[in-house]
A protein has these predicted regions:
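C-terminal structural segments of small proteins and small subunits
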Residues: 10, 44-74
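Conserved beta-strand/loop element in small beta-rich adapter and peptidoglycan-binding domains
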Residues: 33-40
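Short, surface-exposed secondary-structure edge patches
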Residues: 4, 27-31
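Short, basic/aromatic beta-hairpin or loop at an interaction surface
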Residues: 6-19
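Short alpha-helix capping/helix-loop boundary micro-motifs
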Residues: 22-26
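Short, acidic/hydrophobic/Gly-rich beta-strand patch recurrent on exposed beta strands
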Residues: 15-16, 31, 51-54
């Protein structure tokens, strides 16, 4: 399992679990649910934030938030 912050642009992955943290509920409300497929669409010029497609939506996450999401490759 890898962290979402380690995944390359365009590589589809599946959310597996979250690091226990206060951001857990915020991520769930945004559509980051275990079993959901995600793709990193873009990375800002300085590497932070990243743009992600999840549940048909395009969202931005900071790298420290993405590092709390564990994913697996199909």
């Amino acid at each position: 399992m890898k962290r979402l912050s380690e995944i390359a642009i365009g590589q589809p992955v599946t959310i597996e679990k979250f690091e226990e943290d206060e951001i857990f509920l915020k991520l769930m409300e945004m559509g980051f649910i275990p079993g959901e497929k995600v793709i990193i669409e873009q990375v800002a010029p300085l590497g932070d934030p990243i743009s992600i497609e999840v549940a048909g939506y395009r969202l931005s996450l900071r790298l420290n938030e993405a590092s709390k999401i564990f994913v697996s490759e199909p």
